[in-house]
Design a protein with these regions (language model features):
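Short gly/ser-rich loop at a beta-strand->alpha-helix junction or flexible surface loop bordering the NTP-binding
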Residues: 1-138, 145-201
Length: 201
């Protein structure tokens, strides 16, 4: 159990069955510990040390560990979209689901918890940063992801303004994002108008 405690310390009390196996601890041992109340099974392949203090980021860590446990060798997993904006503190949104981006080639074999939304995209190294030990898409990437999936200009404009205020974006980056959003919005409006039918003429 001491080995599991040491392992879980790296993830604020969380560990995966894959990590335990690397220490020579079989899945059956984890199952028995869970039955005895020493571990809590959070999702398939993810456990928490019982009574371990949790923090506001616990669910995000669990989502990342779930994805890592779901696919061998999965690289460039990152918390993303609305979740990333919330982590950076640049959005008033409080999404009920945790948004996570995994590579397009990923075939997640484990049952997905209903509170996780999985997006698939091939992130570059420069598009992923770290926040309190967790992989998170960069501010710029997160804003564009939210815009591409929601088309909510109010959300992304607020995020850009607050990121600029907090020093998370440079003036040049903020200007570039605003131009992309304005251009995309204008293009969408043009396509909508051109594609509409005129009746009653």
């Amino acid at each position: 159990m001491d080995e599991l405690h040491a392992l879980a310390e790296e993830h604020e009390g969380l560990l995966t069955s894959k990590e335990a196996r690397s220490l020579g601890i079989q899945d059956s041992v984890l199952v028995r510990l869970a039955q005895r109340g020493r571990l809590e099974r959070m999702s398939r392949g993810v456990y928490r040390i019982a009574h371990y203090p949790t923090d506001r980021l616990a669910q995000y860590r669990e989502a990342v560990l779930w994805a890592q446990a779901s696919h061998h060798g999965l690289e460039r997993i990152a918390l993303s979209h609305e979740t990333a904006l919330l982590i950076y503190g640049i959005s008033d949104l409080n999404p009920s689901r945790v948004h996570l981006t995994v590579p397009k080639s990923a075939r997640l074999r484990r049952e997905r918890p209903e509170w996780i939304t999985v997006h698939q995209a091939d992130l570059t190294e420069k598009e992923v940063g770290q926040h309190e030990g967790m992989p998170v898409t960069t501010v710029s990437r997160s804003i564009m992801d939210v815009f591409s999936t929601t088309h909510r200009t109010d959300i992304v404009r607020q995020a850009i303004t607050e990121a600029l205020r907090d020093g998370l974006l440079s003036s040049a980056q903020a200007t570039g994002l605003r131009r992309i959003i304005i251009s995309s919005t204008a293009e969408s409006l043009s396509l909508s108008i051109n594609g509409s039918k005129v009746t009653g003429a």
